[in-house]
UniProtKB/Swiss-Prot annotation:
Protein's UniProt name: UPF0298 protein ABC2380
Source organism phylogeny: Bacteria, Bacillati, Bacillota, Bacilli, Bacillales
Compartments where located: Cytoplasm
Cellular component GO terms held in the UniProt record: cytoplasm
InterPro entries with a match to the protein in the record: DUF2129
Organism: Shouchella clausii (strain KSM-K16) (Alkalihalobacillus clausii)
HAMAP family attached to this UniProt entry: UPF0298 (MF_01126)
Keyword field: Cytoplasm
Length: 92
């Protein structure tokens, strides 16, 4: 499980042979061979610096930080439909 002070960064590369170099910036979670991108996690306080630093490398085409820590996942007033609620009670 990821602690709340971590944030994901997606880095698109020109070649996957440079993917190993990204391990020094954070915890590499996933490497896509087909689409040539790497997902890794680092401390949230270091994200702006890392985005600038990673963008300056010659093998990086694009860098995007994850917005998941800033999205509210607790919804208010979300009620299911009455018809679905009735079906759930019947076990259909």
């Amino acid at each position: 499980m990821i602690s709340p002070n971590r944030q994901g960064i997606v880095v698109w590369l020109t070649s996957l042979k440079y993917a190993r170099q990204l391990r020094r910036f954070g915890h590499v979670q996933y490497v896509s061979k087909k689409m040539k991108y790497v997902v890794f996690y680092c401390d949230q306080s270091k994200v702006p610096e890392l985005v600038d630093k990673l963008s300056s490398f010659h093998f990086v085409t694009d860098v995007k930080p994850s917005m998941r820590p800033f999205i509210n996942t607790e919804y208010e007033g979300a009620k299911p439909d009455k018809a679905k609620e009735y079906d759930y009670k019947l076990g259909i």
